[in-house]
């Protein structure tokens, strides 16, 4: 009687076309597709994309209603080209004639007194050894020793120039100051473009010299001239301090 249930089971399995595995897992045939579902809810916003290239400039806007204040003044420009020289002007009117000197007795008296005072002063200074007169020249010294350029400036401020001998008499007069103060002195000569070519301050060649034997020997490195106590000359660097002697 137990065969009946078993036979019934086999008949049912054959009728349904189903195949049962040994592990009790059944695989059916695909069913009929269902109807499409309704639309789902909107998704979340995605992340920001990469920055794009700048767009072209927009059109110019209309001018503003409020005008801007004027800017600051610019820098001065370069000077212009000089203009042509103007024509020479006409000569001015001739002034009134001056008073003849011989008619001005007061002026003549003043000049006479002035000359007398100058002669008295010159005589007093000569006795003190502060000045010496040779011909039309007057030599003077203050006893100070400074550089060549400083001597030139000091003499110019006094209305003279640095002393320079142009003959033996003037050389001896300058040497007397050198002996008195027992120190060397510059004379108004400087070396020209060529070594050993010494000239006066106006650039003219010397017409009188009293060089010590073998001098000048600086070969362009000693451009000034100093005087020894015996009156002889030597070329020397201009930066040394030497006795100030001026001529007027």
Swiss-Prot record:
Changing residue 198 to S: In ILD2; the mutant protein is retained in the endoplasmic reticulum and is not secreted. InterPro entries: C-type_lectin-like (IPR001304), C-type_lectin-like/link_sf (IPR016186), C-type_lectin_CS (IPR018378), CLec_Tetranectin-domain (IPR051663), Collectin_CTLD (IPR033990), CTDL_fold (IPR016187). Oligomeric complex of 6 set of homotrimers. Residues 28-100 form the Collagen-like domain. Residues 33-101 are annotated as: Disordered. Transmembrane segments: none annotated. It comes from the Eukaryota. Residues 1-20 form the signal peptide. Changing residue 242 to Q: In ILD2; uncertain significance; impaired secretion. GO terms for cellular component: clathrin-coated endocytic vesicle; collagen trimer; endoplasmic reticulum membrane; extracellular region; extracellular space; lamellar body; multivesicular body. Residues 71-82 have a biased composition (Low complexity). Residues 54-70 have a biased composition (Pro residues). The keyword Lyase does not apply. Residues 132-248 form the C-type lectin domain. It comes from Homo sapiens (Human). Keywords: Acetylation, Calcium, Collagen, Disease variant, Disulfide bond, Extracellular matrix, Gaseous exchange, Glycoprotein, Hydroxylation, Lectin, Secreted, Signal, Surface film. Its main location: secreted. It is linked to Interstitial lung disease 2: A form of interstitial lung disease, a heterogeneous group of diseases affecting the distal part of the lung and characterized by a progressive remodeling of the alveolar interstitium. The disease spectrum ranges from idiopathic interstitial pneumonia or pneumonitis to idiopathic pulmonary fibrosis, that is associated with an increased risk of developing lung cancer. Clinical features of interstitial lung disease include dyspnea, clubbing of the fingers, and restrictive lung capacity. ILD2 inheritance is autosomal dominant. N-acetylated. It is found in: Secreted; Secreted, Extracellular space, Extracellular matrix; Secreted, Extracellular space, Surface film. SUPFAM superfamilies: C-type lectin-like, Triple coiled coil domain of C-type lectins. Changing residue 233 to L: In ILD2; impaired secretion. This is Pulmonary surfactant-associated protein A2. Disulfide bonds join 155-246, 224-238. In presence of calcium ions, it binds to surfactant phospholipids and contributes to lower the surface tension at the air-liquid interface in the alveoli of the mammalian lung and is essential for normal respiration. GO terms for molecular function: carbohydrate binding.
